[in-house]
């Protein structure tokens, strides 16, 4: 590509966060950011290295020596001992240290290099720049490949070009970029994605495509992961084992629910019903069931709640907000927990097991109702005749007899 066509700089493929914004990202978002950024840099480098090589030949320099100078980190072993990184496109899987093995902070630069790309931004346009600028990028790149701090290299070595790397605040640029690079746009709803594979999966919500079929019952799925989960129903496979008691489960979520029984200590006991809780505030909230206290009121409809979280969830009914969308059928929900329960209709997952008969259920509430068969509990009593029922719905049906309404 000649210069008249324009060149792509590292800045063009860079997304930066302020320190405050970075601290708000959770670990999975940070890893995704690094996945995107390192892929961008490696792709750009694979193109720009050749441009640099052509430039060196035009300048009658020694290409091998220039390449060596570009990629060698000062005071480290020669590039020949590190493998042939020059002369081929860098491979994200082999030429960079695994992102999940790199800590979120390096000791370098007063522990402020939090996966930010400012080390690379000093090279505004790679092609045609001086060798020392190339070396600066090479140093930063190889630093990622090392799994330890280069204690033999002074801080000043990284600041030769006088770029904004000399103090802590300069590590984070003042851009207000809120989202990661998302170049793949859905033509149906304009939702954006970082990777093409995610866009392809998402489009199945609109097209209804379900390319993954169970070879036992012929049920189809839009995602392979859901098919794999579903097939465990047929195979009986239980890959998730509790390290405490050895009990195995079909799905990881089943194991997580089970492990709570081992992990939780519940020293706070309700004097009314004997139920125990891990924290005192949970007991206080629970006791409102017995006292009837409902301190949280909806300003739209005046409905009251004994938990603030229940009020917040309820208010979404008025706003119409449904943030959680099913990737299988596109149905959306107010709460993430509702989506999780709904997804089990697609996967067939039933994480709640009856300890009496082994029957499994997709919802905890359904298990509770089922347990009354074994315990004989009938908490719903007719005020007219005293007959008791295990379920409120059955009491409602029964009461129609007294008022003359046909069930």
Swiss-Prot record:
* Localisation: Nucleus
The segment annotated Required for correct nuclear localization and exclusion from the nucleoli runs over 2-167
List this protein's GO terms for biological process.
regulation of transcription by RNA polymerase II
Read off the PROSITE patterns from this record: KRAB, ZINC_FINGER_C2H2_1, ZINC_FINGER_C2H2_2
Q: Name one GO cellular component term.
A: nucleus
Q: Which UniProt keywords apply?
A: DNA-binding, Isopeptide bond, Metal-binding, Nucleus, Repeat, Transcription, Transcription regulation, Ubl conjugation, Zinc, Zinc-finger
Q: Which GO terms describe its molecular function?
A: DNA-binding transcription factor activity, RNA polymerase II-specific; RNA polymerase II cis-regulatory region sequence-specific DNA binding; sequence-specific double-stranded DNA binding; zinc ion binding
**Database matches in InterPro entries:** KRAB, KRAB_dom_sf, Znf_C2H2_sf, Znf_C2H2_type
Q: Where are the zinc fingers (C2H2-type)?
A: 184-206, 212-234, 240-262, 268-290, 296-318, 324-346, 352-374, 380-402
Annotated KRAB domain ranges read 8-83
Task: Identify the stretch(es) annotated as Does not affect nuclear localization pattern.
Answer: 171-404
Q: Tell me the SUPFAM superfamilies matching this sequence.
A: beta-beta-alpha zinc fingers, KRAB domain (Kruppel-associated box)
Domain of life from the UniProt record: Eukaryota
UniProt cross-link Glycyl lysine isopeptide (Lys-Gly) (interchain with G-Cter in SUMO2), position: 74, 114, 145
Describe its function: May be involved in transcriptional regulation.
User: What does the sequence similarity comment in the record state about its family?
Assistant: Belongs to the krueppel C2H2-type zinc-finger protein family.
Name under which the protein is recorded: Zinc finger protein 1 homolog
């Amino acid at each position: 590509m000649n210069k008249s066509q324009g060149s792509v700089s590292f800045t063009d493929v860079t997304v930066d966060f302020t320190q405050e914004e970075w601290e708000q990202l959770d670990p999975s978002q940070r890893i995704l950011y690094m996945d995107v950024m390192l892929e961008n840099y490696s792709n750009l480098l694979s193109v720009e290295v050749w441009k640099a090589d052509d430039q060196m030949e035009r300048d009658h320099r020694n290409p091998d020596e220039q390449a060596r100078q570009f990629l060698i980190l000062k005071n480290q072993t020669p590039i020949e001992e590190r493998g042939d990184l020059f002369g081929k496109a860098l491979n994200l899987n082999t030429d960079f240290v695994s992102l999940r093995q790199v800590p979120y902070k390096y000791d370098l630069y007063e522990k402020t290099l939090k996966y930010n790309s400012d080390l690379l931004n000093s090279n505004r346009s790679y092609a045609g720049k001086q060798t020392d600028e190339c070396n600066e990028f090479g140093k930063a790149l190889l630093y990622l490949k090392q799994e330890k701090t280069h204690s033999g290299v002074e801080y000043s070595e990284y600041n030769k070009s006088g770029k904004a790397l000399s103090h802590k605040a300069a590590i984070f640029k003042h851009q207000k970029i809120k989202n990661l690079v998302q170049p793949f746009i859905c033509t149906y709803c304009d939702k954006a994605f970082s990777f093409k594979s995610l866009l392809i999966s998402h489009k199945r919500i609109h097209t209804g495509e379900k390319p993954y079929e169970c070879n036992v019952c012929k049920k189809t799925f839009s995602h392979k992961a859901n098919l794999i989960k579903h097939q465990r129903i047929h195979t009986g496979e239980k890959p998730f084992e509790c390290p405490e008691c050895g009990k195995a489960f079909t799905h990881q979520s089943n194991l997580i629910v089970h492990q709570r029984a081992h992990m939780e200590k519940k020293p706070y006991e309700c004097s009314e019903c004997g139920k125990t809780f891990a924290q005192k505030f949970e007991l206080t909230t629970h006791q409102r069931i017995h006292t009837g206290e409902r301190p949280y009121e909806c300003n739209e409809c005046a409905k009251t709640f004994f938990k603030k979280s229940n009020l917040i969830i309820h208010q979404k009914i008025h706003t119409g907000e449904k943030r959680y969308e099913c990737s299988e059928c596109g149905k959306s929900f107010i709460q993430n927990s509702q989506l999780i329960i709904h997804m089990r209709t697609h996967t067939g997952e039933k994480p709640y097991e009856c300890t009496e008969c082994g029957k499994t259920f997709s919802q905890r509430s359904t298990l509770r109702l089922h347990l009354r068969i074994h315990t004989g509990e009938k908490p719903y009593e007719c005020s007219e005749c005293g007959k008791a029922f295990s379920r409120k719905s059955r009491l409602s049906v029964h009461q129609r007899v007294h008022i003359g309404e046909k069930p």
